[in-house]
């Protein structure tokens, strides 16, 4: 098991679904890099630095996981990190078509980069960062969907936005 894998995403914020996939990827690969995309087109609620910090806190117990922010093409980031595998999550069949297109594009751009798809545990299959933010924005309790530190950070971020 000498493979370096990248699990890329925006992680705005990291959810229990993300954490579940990270834990399982950490068992499959020698080294897992969580690549947090700057992705300004998504207009994230948390800054890149805040997202890196939150993911670091959630994954602190995993010795073979490293969290790195990046911008630009994912395949270029993978080359910089000497990773040969991309880990992607599939929550539902609806995710498959988009992920299939991404995998094929990434293969064209970097033929040696292999995409591996993991499905979340059933209890996490419906969770998305967008839904978590929506629930939190309307005053709902998100504690069952995110790590306690993420719930606190989200509450603080939303309270600042309201002020």
UniProtKB/Swiss-Prot annotation:
Keywords: ATP-binding, Coenzyme A biosynthesis, Cytoplasm, Magnesium, Nucleotide-binding, Nucleotidyltransferase, Transferase
InterPro entries on file: Cyt_trans-like, PPAT, Rossmann-like_a/b/a_fold
Enzyme Commission (EC) number: 2.7.7.3
This protein's record includes keyword Transferase: yes
A GO molecular function held by the record: pantetheine-phosphate adenylyltransferase activity
Gene from which this protein is expressed: coaD
Site-annotated residues for Transition state stabilizer: 18
Quaternary structure note: Homohexamer.
Catalytic reactions on record: (R)-4'-phosphopantetheine + ATP + H(+) = 3'-dephospho-CoA + diphosphate
SUPFAM superfamilies assigned to the protein according to its UniProt record, in alphabetical order: Nucleotidylyl transferase
Identification of the protein by name: Phosphopantetheine adenylyltransferase
């Amino acid at each position: 098991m000498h493979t370096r894998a990248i699990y890329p995403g925006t992680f705005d914020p990291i959810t229990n679904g993300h954490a579940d996939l990270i834990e399982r990827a950490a068992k499959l690969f020698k080294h897992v890099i969580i690549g947090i995309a700057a992705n300004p087109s998504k207009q994230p609620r948390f800054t890149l630095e805040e997202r890196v910090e939150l993911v670091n806190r959630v994954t602190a117990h995993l010795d073979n996981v490293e969290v790195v922010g990046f911008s630009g093409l994912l395949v270029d980031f993978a080359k910089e990190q000497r990773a040969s595998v991309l880990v992607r999550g599939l929550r539902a069949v609806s995710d498959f078509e988009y992920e299939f297109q991404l995998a094929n594009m990434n293969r064209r751009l970097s033929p040696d980069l292999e995409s591996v798809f993991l499905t979340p545990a059933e209890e996490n299959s419906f969770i998305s960062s967008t839904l978590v933010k929506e629930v939190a924005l309307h005053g709902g309790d998100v504690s069952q969907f995110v790590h306690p530190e993420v719930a606190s950070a989200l509450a603080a971020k939303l309270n600042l936005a309201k002020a």
